[in-house]
Amino acid sequence: MSQQVIIFDTTLRDGEQALQASLSVKEKLQIALALERMGVDVMEVGFPVSSPGDFESVQTIARQVKNSRVCALARCVEKDIDVAAESLKVAEAFRIHTFIATSPMHIATKLRSTLDEVIERAIYMVKRARNYTDDVEFSCEDAGRTPIADLARVVEAAINAGATTINIPDTVGYTMPFEFAGIISGLYERVPNIDKAIISVHTHDDLGLAVGNSLAAVHAGARQVEGAMNGIGERAGNCSLEEVIMAIKVRKDILNVHTAINHQEIWRTSQLVSQICNMPIPANKAIVGSGAFAHSSGIHQDGVLKNRENYEIMTPESIGLNQIQLNLTSRSGRAAVKHRMDEMGYKESEYNLDNLYDAFLKLADKKGQVFDYDLEALAFIGKQQEEPEHFRLDYFSVQSSSNDIATAAVKLACGEEVKAEAANGNGPVDAVYQAINRITDYNVELVKYSLTAKGHGKDALGQVDIVANYNGRRFHGVGLATDIVESSAKAMVHVLNNIWRAAEVEKELQRKAQHNENNKETV
């Protein structure tokens, strides 16, 4: 009988560590709700003790996610576990994930400890976590380089202490698939109480083997796989969840396991993560790359036309990719736009129909026909800009030629006041940015700029993603328009609003901290 493999998503914890700019609470929640819709069993959404912002993110997600178990990370440190529990207590169901290094190298050079001390600490911390929840996961950091006898001792002790999931990470992506399968098999042979816990794996892609190692572990008996959408993560990334999920589905004949994932949501979730995290998906990326279902060879094209199964082991539709693109025009009504969004799988709660329709009409007037990819881009940008705005682009104009310095004039609404400035720059985009900096006095430093076409042809929407540095912190901004300079200006204004909102959040956190301190003094 087929057994279920639990899908543990760590996009918002381990995956976020790869980003050049931290995600806002709203952006994290948007991804969390998409993961819930996709059907992940567990989502690890942060490391609450690391910062007040991470604590708030975990708490916000724990309060709103209902159908997936929410998890937070904690070192084998009392404060970590207590803070994780505090952030999660609003959830309907939650898990605490605690970890400690077990390899000789890490124990000697990082922890400056002994294996016996590590085991003692693991036991104590697992028991502490069990005081808050009956769902405790324990990870043996750098398990891939831990001798199997040592690893078995730690695992047995953690299970006896109350751990219900034991995670075996290949922390540095060093292990080969046959080795990793041997580790899992070895634990089943050596740990007498292993049937009392679920064995999980967490692999990294330093040698390009993360997915292979995870599947080898599943074949050897692991029943939870940890990873991130699109494989994002530190260094070369995490195990790519969509690849593992589809491999399990396509090769159920040999693996004899299944997941509870809604496969129809894979493509949309992948695209959302890519857009919010500002990490483009390579065209040749398995499952979700733009070329994953493309056939250019004449022989292949002929074979696909005769029978798709000749060269396709899965269909685009199986991951929710609808290849039929319908177009709307400025004569299409609000109901037609809503109907198309419904057909693409969007719920009304995921976008504001009034705002989307207004943006649709403006775009339709410019380019005539609006396609599915245009609607999705407009819905995404609309969601990103739903929060209160302190800054708003009122007007801009640019003068530029091949031989002269570009000049830009910009009007920016700053709260209730409209300010205007002009500036020169090395090209039209730089001139606009110089003018905006003069208006705000923020002195924002551009770190990364990227442009992506949303659609095809000369009238395609251009999405500009930027990362900017301000006071030692990095902020992400995104803008969308058929004009590249306008997209660029909107992206910078988005950055300014994110800076302003971050400052407002910091003020609110300080106010709450002061309020709590005053209450303590009163008591």
Curated annotation (Swiss-Prot):
Pathway annotation: Amino-acid biosynthesis; L-leucine biosynthesis; L-leucine from 3-methyl-2-oxobutanoate: step 1/4
CDD domains in alphabetical order: DRE_TIM_IPMS
Keywords: Amino-acid biosynthesis, Branched-chain amino acid biosynthesis, Cytoplasm, Leucine biosynthesis, Manganese, Metal-binding, Transferase
PROSITE patterns: AIPM_HOMOCIT_SYNTH_1, AIPM_HOMOCIT_SYNTH_2, PYR_CT
Segments traversing the membrane: none
UniProt keyword annotation of Heme present: no
Alphabetized SUPFAM superfamilies for the sequence: 2-isopropylmalate synthase LeuA, allosteric (dimerisation) domain, Aldolase
Catalytic activity: 3-methyl-2-oxobutanoate + acetyl-CoA + H2O = (2S)-2-isopropylmalate + CoA + H(+)
Subcellular location: Cytoplasm
EC number annotated for this UniProt entry: 2.3.3.13
SMART domains: LeuA_dimer (SM00917)
Sequence segments annotated as region (Regulatory domain): 392-523
Cofactor(s) needed by this chain: Mn(2+)
Domain Pyruvate carboxyltransferase positions: 5-267
GO cellular component, one term: cytosol
Keyword Signal attributed: no
Lineage top rank: taxon: Bacteria
Residues noted as binding Mn(2+) in the record, renumbered to the chain: 14, 202, 204, 238
Family (UniProt): Belongs to the alpha-IPM synthase/homocitrate synthase family. LeuA type 1 subfamily.
Protein name: 2-isopropylmalate synthase
Organism encoding this protein: Shigella dysenteriae serotype 1 (strain Sd197)
Gene: leuA
